[in-house]
């Protein structure tokens, strides 16, 4: 977390608010799995806050707002099944489909037969 005693304060109150909002959203982002809709929307909100000018922030927000309004709480935790083409996306770093559905993991069990 950002330590105000070790780092410089932003030049304006707006900068301080944006910095605190980004730090909060980063903490919320950690509660979502990387391949979920909620994670993607949090990343989009962070990009809205990080926009340098009002027009860019407004354009980004108008793209994010409809997705936020139509998404239910359960949809935010569900995996995203849309194909993604960005190389830095966390969805490309880990594969969900590593194991087949019918294969179960075996556990070592001690021999419990009586002699």
Curated annotation (Swiss-Prot):
Location (main, coarse): host cell
UniProt keyword annotation of Signal present: no
Alphabetized UniProt keyword annotations: Host cytoplasm, Host-virus interaction, Inhibition of host innate immune response by virus, Suppressor of RNA silencing, Viral immunoevasion
InterPro entries registered for this protein in UniProt: Gemini_V2, WCCH
One Pfam assignment: WCCH
Subcellular location: Host cytoplasm, Host perinuclear region
Chain's role: Through its interaction with host SGS3, acts as a suppressor of RNA-mediated gene silencing, also known as post-transcriptional gene silencing (PTGS), a mechanism of plant viral defense that limits the accumulation of viral RNAs.
Family stated for the protein in its record: Belongs to the geminiviridae protein AV2/V2 family.
Protein name: Protein V2
Taxonomic source organism: Tomato yellow leaf curl Sardinia virus (isolate Spain-2) (TYLCSV)
